[in-house]
């Protein structure tokens, strides 16, 4: 067995959510105010990762107009059940002191 070194994804990949589907592993990470929304990486060995896409590419899924620095998508959660991937994510529109203006969403897909 090969030794896995942290971080498993080099660079800026906050709030990782990992799911295993058969022999495949997928990680979803936050993108904050950056478009397109949420990064998805894939691996079969937890060592070699490849960016396979951005699931949120339409305004109807992710409207980032008006969000400021460090706002936008926070902490996506990627799961899989009975042949369907589920991605839950929060869009932080604004935050002031201890007050957050957020919206939560769910998107589904049969494959990634």
Identify what each model region corresponds to.
Residues 1-112:
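Carbohydrate-active catalytic/glycan-binding domains of CAZyme proteins
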């Amino acid at each position: 067995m090969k030794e896995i070194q942290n971080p498993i994804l080099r660079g800026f990949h906050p709030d990782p959510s990992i799911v295993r589907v058969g022999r495949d592993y997928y990680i979803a990470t936050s993108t904050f105010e950056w478009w397109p929304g949420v990064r998805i990486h894939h691996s079969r060995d937890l060592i070699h990762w490849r960016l396979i896409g951005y699931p949120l590419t339409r305004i109807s899924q992710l409207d980032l107009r008006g969000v400021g620095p460090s706002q936008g998508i926070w902490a996506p959660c990627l799961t899989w059940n009975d042949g369907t991937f589920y991605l839950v994510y929060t869009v932080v529109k604004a935050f002031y002191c201890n007050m957050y203006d957020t919206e939560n969403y769910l998107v589904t897909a049969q494959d990634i």
